[in-house]
Swiss-Prot record:
The protein's Enzyme Commission number: 2.3.3.1
Lineage of the species this protein comes from: Eukaryota, Metazoa, Chordata, Craniata, Vertebrata
Pathway(s) the chain acts in: Carbohydrate metabolism; tricarboxylic acid cycle; isocitrate from oxaloacetate: step 1/2
Name of this chain's protein: Citrate synthase, mitochondrial
One Pfam match: Citrate_synt
Residue numbers carrying N6-acetyllysine: 94, 100, 148, 155, 166
Superkingdom of the source species: Eukaryota
Residues reported to bind oxaloacetate: 129, 201
Length: 213
């Protein structure tokens, strides 16, 4: 559809995606804001800064950033969390007890795997972007089964990771939550999640490019 200059970026974007639910527009405002930039050390932001430092065209700088985001270690994290949560729910069922969930987490770690959505290369506390999404979920979808599972993991996983002693940061990151919110509002096409990330990051990294010049 056509761009409506009276609406903000997020509202126009959700309209073009075919969504009319006001809460989804509110979620997209949150999502696009918290994913727009994150220091300069992650792959996509760093790449855009690096290419832009050569005075390359901003579109080329952003395209380079998206090539970095295409890498599974960077751009697929929230999808991997959602797949893991779905598998967990399938194996242990809904309304799982804390004890059974602890056993599942320990079995995951003892088999040499990690708990997706936990840990961060820089942060040493709960990712504030996770906290923003948690507040949104508590307000709009407190009884959603997947959100309840995410909230339950938040109570359990950090203590287990601290007890294990290997994680420098046992707290959840932004990817631990975003997929659950998108699924709730009907955006089930997980392959599109990285595109959302890219749309968001455009605002942050290109603003940085302008400031740098």
């Amino acid at each position: 559809g056509a761009i409506d200059s009276k609406l903000d970026w997020s509202h126009n974007f959700t309209n073009m995606l075919g969504y009319t639910e006001p809460q989804f527009t509110e979620l997209m405002r949150l999502y696009l804001t918290i994913h727009s930039d994150h220091e300069g050390g992650n792959v996509s932001a760093h790449t855009s800064h690096l290419v832009g430092s050569a005075l390359s065209d901003p579109y080329l700088s952003f395209a380079a950033a998206m090539n970095g985001l295409a890498g599974p270690l960077h751009g697929l994290a929230n999808q991997e969390v959602l797949v893991w949560l779905t598998q967990l729910q399938k194996e242990v069922g809904k309304d799982v007890s804390d004890e059974k969930l602890r056993d599942y987490i320990w079995n995951t770690l003892n088999s040499g795997r990690v708990v997706p959505g936990y840990g961060h290369a820089v942060l040493r506390k709960t990712d504030p972007r996770y906290s923003c999404q948690r507040e949104f979920a508590l307000k709009h979808l407190p009884n959603d089964p997947l959100f309840k599972l995410v909230a339950q993991l938040y109570k359990i996983v950090p203590n287990i990771l601290l007890e294990q002693g290997k994680a420098k940061n046992p707290w959840p990151n932004v990817d631990a939550h975003s997929g659950v919110l998108l699924q709730y509002y009907g955006m089930t096409e997980m392959n599109y999640y990285t595109v959302l990330f890219g749309v968001s990051r455009a605002l942050g990294v290109l603003a940085q490019l302008i400031w740098s010049r």
